[in-house]
């Protein structure tokens, strides 16, 4: 009996050992084949995705070289002397014969009335509580045993999301009214935008060191006189290193931008790309101005009723020149108009440092375009002009503003205030059609496009509204701000 019992015990032990080994192997197999993936940071994915549009959405475009530009030495193959062709009279005579050039620009049916083949528009992340987030941002599913407990919780979250949407909508309307009055604050922004602004303030990518004095209580006249005395349009003229050593003096247009348009320009229009301009029926009014400025890749074809068709000046950021999807070299959007490009540079405006490491390498395509189209006026704004505008915004704002360059919109407004007797700006300060649609020609939504995260947009708009001499009705219904040209401002001696 004992031998049988002993054999039985040994068999039991072997069986237990075999089952244990089997379970260990199974456990190791499943844990090795499906390792736990670390959960992505909620800020790194969601906030980055949400905040990219704050820089115009295009700041997310990759592929542009930021290294030392190649092929920018113009000592060989650069166009020498004055250009030939139909604009020779403009280049040679300068201010005397600009009307010949202007007649081509301001009275034309824009060849740029259609959009280039653009990349697919981005998709927006979740903007408000209750909005569906992007794919991949969904919370992990609950375990089966906990599903019954999550029902009431989900209902409460849904109700809370709807309450959040209503609250934000209410805040947005309140902020719009305060913006119309010119006394809004960053504290009224959505928490997401406040968080973004704080991040940019801490980062200070461009090394901003503001040493000016703040004078936020200036009257409209004092502010206009300060602008007149300090804001002088400046572009690269090829006389400063490193551009002087590269032959840029023979490359840039011989007539400065400030003297290009005749002083008979009575009124000019600055047409923003804001989605709020849709269904405005402002096209005919916009085309009635002597000159019209537009931005980046904003088309007119298909939108003529709302945005008009005339284009005189187009301001483009450096991404337009560097990203192939914009077809900068061959698109009709950028032909037969005055082009003005810009790129963020260090606050010190060190041209050597900027040339070696631009935000996007606009120098090479600029050289190529000038060599191919020597008769088309094409300028690059000087970094000192860009940061001078930033200084003025900060000087006239109580709060600290983002240490990033002003938006293309603000740059364009101040540019036209230097060139025109009166400037009408459309949908820069939003009308009652306010929307989170970033651009009228792209299905992309983000509040940062209107109120700013990267650019100090909120403070720019508050400053512009302080300068507004137009009517409240035009502001509310049309989103139109009327600004006096700086040359028309009458200032006391010494102002």
UniProtKB/Swiss-Prot annotation:
Biased composition, class Basic residues, residue ranges: 144-153
Enzyme Commission identifier(s): 2.4.3.1
SUPFAM superfamilies: Glycoside hydrolase/deacetylase (SSF88713)
Region listing for Disordered, in residue ranges: 63-90, 107-165
Membrane-protein topology: Single-pass type II membrane protein
GO CC, any one term: Golgi apparatus
Domain of life, source organism: Eukaryota
Keywords, comma-separated and alphabetical: Disulfide bond, Glycoprotein, Glycosyltransferase, Golgi apparatus, Membrane, Signal-anchor, Transferase, Transmembrane, Transmembrane helix
Function: Transfers sialic acid from the donor of substrate CMP-sialic acid to galactose containing acceptor substrates. Has alpha-2,6-sialyltransferase activity toward oligosaccharides that have the Gal-beta-1,4-GlcNAc sequence at the non-reducing end of their carbohydrate groups, but it has weak or no activities toward glycoproteins and glycolipids.
Protein name from the UniProt record: Beta-galactoside alpha-2,6-sialyltransferase 2
Name of the gene encoding the protein in the UniProt record: ST6GAL2
């Amino acid at each position: 009996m004992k031998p049988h019992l002993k054999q039985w015990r040994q068999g039991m032990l072997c069986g237990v050992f075999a089952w244990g080994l089997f379970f260990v192997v199974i456990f190791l197999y499943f844990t090795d084949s499906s390792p736990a993936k670390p959960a992505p940071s909620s800020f790194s994915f969601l906030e980055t995705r949400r905040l990219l549009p704050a820089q115009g959405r295009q700041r997310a475009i990759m592929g542009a070289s930021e290294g030392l530009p190649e092929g920018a030495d113009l000592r060989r193959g650069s166009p020498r002397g004055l250009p030939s062709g139909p604009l020779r009279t403009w280049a040679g005579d300068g201010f005397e014969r600009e009307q010949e050039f202007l007649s081509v620009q301001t009275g034309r049916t824009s060849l740029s009335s259609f959009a280039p083949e653009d990349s697919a528009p981005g998709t927006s992340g979740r903007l408000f509580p209750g909005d569906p987030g992007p794919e991949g941002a969904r919370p992990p599913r609950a375990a089966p045993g906990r599903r019954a407990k999550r029902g009431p919780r989900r209902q409460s979250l849904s109700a809370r999301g709807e309450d959040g949407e209503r609250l934000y909508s209410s805040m947005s309307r309140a902020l719009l009214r305060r913006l119309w009055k010119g006394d809004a604050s960053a504290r009224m922004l959505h928490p997401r935008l406040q968080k973004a602004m704080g991040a940019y303030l801490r980062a200070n990518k461009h090394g901003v060191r503001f040493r000016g004095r703040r004078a936020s209580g200036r009257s409209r006249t004092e502010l206009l006189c300060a602008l007149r005395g300090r804001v002088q349009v400046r572009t690269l003229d090829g006389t400063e290193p490193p551009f002087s050593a590269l032959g840029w003096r023979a490359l840039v247009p011989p007539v400065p931008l400030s003297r290009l348009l005749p002083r008979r320009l009575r009124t000019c229009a600055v047409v923003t790309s804001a989605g709020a301009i849709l269904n405005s029926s402002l096209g005919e009014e916009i085309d009635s101005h002597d000159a019209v400025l537009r931005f980046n890749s904003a088309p007119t074809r298909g939108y003529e009723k709302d945005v008009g068709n005339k284009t005189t000046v187009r301001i483009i950021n450096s991404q337009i020149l560097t990203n192939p999807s914009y077809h900068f070299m061959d698109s009709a959007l950028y032909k037969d108009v005055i082009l003005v490009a810009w790129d963020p540079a260090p606050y010190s405006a060190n041209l050597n440092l900027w040339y070696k490491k631009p935000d996007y390498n606009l120098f090479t395509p600029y050289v190529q375009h000038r060599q191919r189209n020597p008769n088309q006026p094409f300028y690059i704004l000087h970094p000192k002009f860009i940061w001078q505008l930033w200084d003025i915004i900060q000087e006239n704002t109580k709060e600290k503003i983002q240490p990033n360059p002003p938006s293309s919109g603000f740059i364009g407004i101040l540019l036209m205030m230097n060139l025109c007797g009166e400037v009408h700006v459309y949908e820069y300060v939003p009308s009652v059609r306010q929307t989170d649609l970033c651009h009228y020609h792209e299905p992309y939504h983000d509040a940062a496009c209107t109120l700013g995260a990267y650019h100090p947009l909120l403070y720019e708009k508050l400053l512009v509204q302080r300068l507004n001499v137009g009517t409240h009705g035009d502001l509310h219904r049309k989103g139109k701000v009327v600004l006096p040209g700086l040359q028309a401002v009458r200032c006391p001696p010494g102002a």
